[in-house]
Amino acid sequence: MIYKVFYQETKERSPRREQTKSLYLDIDAETELEGRIQARQIIEKNTAYNIEFIELLSEKALEYEKETGVFEVTEF
């Protein structure tokens, strides 16, 4: 399952919509909730990012992300 994670690069400042970034993770999970939990754990272990939202991408959404040219799965 591919998850899109919206985050701020630091927890020191209050979040601003204009500074929100995203990354994509390929998580092997049985349920959507389990995948979200695993994604959060991976990011918290490897970065100091302030996670705003974790979204499971549908097939259509994944196709769109690939078409925009910004899609790249992040590996830690």
From Swiss-Prot:
One GO BP on record is: DNA-templated transcription
| NCBIfam families associated with the record | PRK13667.1
InterPro entries under this entry?
A: RpoY
Enzyme group, top EC level? Answer: transferase
- Family, per the entry? Belongs to the RNA polymerase subunit epsilon family.
The catalytic activity, as recorded, is:
RNA(n) + a ribonucleoside 5'-triphosphate = RNA(n+1) + diphosphate
Supply the EC number(s): 2.7.7.6
GO: which molecular function terms?
A: DNA binding; DNA-directed RNA polymerase activity
Which Gene3D superfamilies did the record assign?
RNAP, epsilon subunit-like
Q: Which domain of life is it from?
A: Bacteria
Which species? Answer: Streptococcus thermophilus (strain ATCC BAA-250 / LMG 18311)
Q: Has UniProt tagged this entry with the keyword Transcription?
A: yes
Query: What gene name is listed for this protein?
Result: rpoY
- What this chain does, per the record? A non-essential component of RNA polymerase (RNAP).
Per UniProt, which keywords does this protein have?
DNA-directed RNA polymerase, Nucleotidyltransferase, Transcription, Transferase
Q: Which named protein is this?
A: DNA-directed RNA polymerase subunit epsilon
Quaternary structure and interacting proteins, as annotated? RNAP is composed of a core of 2 alpha, a beta and a beta' subunit. The core is associated with a delta subunit, and at least one of epsilon or omega. When a sigma factor is associated with the core the holoenzyme is formed, which can initiate transcription.
One Gene Ontology cellular component annotation held by this UniProt entry: DNA-directed RNA polymerase complex
Concerning Pfam families, the annotation shows: RpoY
Q: Is Ubl conjugation included in the keywords of this UniProt record?
A: no
